[in-house]
Amino acid sequence: MEAHLRPLSAAALLLSPAAPLPTAVAASARRASPGGRRWSSVRASAGGGGWLSGLLGGKGGGGAPTAMTVTPGTVKAGDPVLHEPAQDVAPGDIPSEKVQGVIDRMVAVMRKAPGVGLAAPQIGVPLKIIVLEDTQEYISYAPKKDIEAQDRRPFDLLVIINPKLKTTSKRTALFFEGCLSVDGYRALVERHLDVEVSGLDRNGRPIKVEASGWQARILQHECDHLEGTLYVDTMVPRTFRIVDNLDLPLPVGCPPIGAR
């Protein structure tokens, strides 16, 4: 989920120089075959192909980056890994170099973007892992009225493996959301205001997070990714817009922004 850094223009945010990608990050991507499931390697390196080639330019990967494909290290809407359910991480695999490397990569990509949340499928890894973090610095860029309306408060980095989410109230709210896999766009999405998420931390220990307001929204957004759902699948369609049009009036007949 993208951080809302309002003082930066959309162009400045999207066209910021990309960080060099590590040359030794490999993840497993699930593909269907007549004989059942098989696994293949998706390498996130400057010489890699597949989704990374698309990230770097045209279909063959030879073009220059565009404003719509410059969030470094993320796959984009349309890639099958974003539209299929992710798989549980075996508890015994959590200490492994592979899983810990995936987590480190996710945190680095989220912070570089910058964003406030990321799910493993967004870096091409079909595993149930999410990371999220909202800092005072990120929040300081938002208008005070938005911070209050969204009930947005800073929280430290959270890593949750195999998260299970449940709502803890019937309260909902409509606010604009963005996504690092759908660069440059926003839309209104209705979310529950109070949730509880349980799972395992990066050390394999049980973790439970009770969240409300904006943190609850981030958790729902990232957990949706693990089910193959993007925010555009649940948005109010007529509110979909480019970032530069974020402050334009809503179409007639659209539900109002805020708590329901």
From Swiss-Prot:
Cofactor: Zn(2+)
Tissue localization of expression: Mainly expressed in roots. Lower expression in shoots, mature panicles at flowering stages and mature leaves.
Molecular function as annotated in GO: metal ion binding; peptide deformylase activity
Entry note: cofactor: Binds 1 Zn(2+) ion per subunit.
List of residues binding substrate: P114, G115, V116, G117, G178
Residue range covered by the transit peptide: 1-43
Pfam families the UniProt entry points to: Pep_deformylase
Role this protein plays: Removes the formyl group from the N-terminal Met of newly synthesized proteins.
NCBIfam families the UniProt entry points to: pept_deformyl (TIGR00079), PRK00150.1-3 (NF001159)
Subunit structure: Homodimer.
UniProt similarity note: Belongs to the polypeptide deformylase family.
Protein name: Peptide deformylase 1A, chloroplastic
Native source species: Oryza sativa subsp. japonica (Rice)
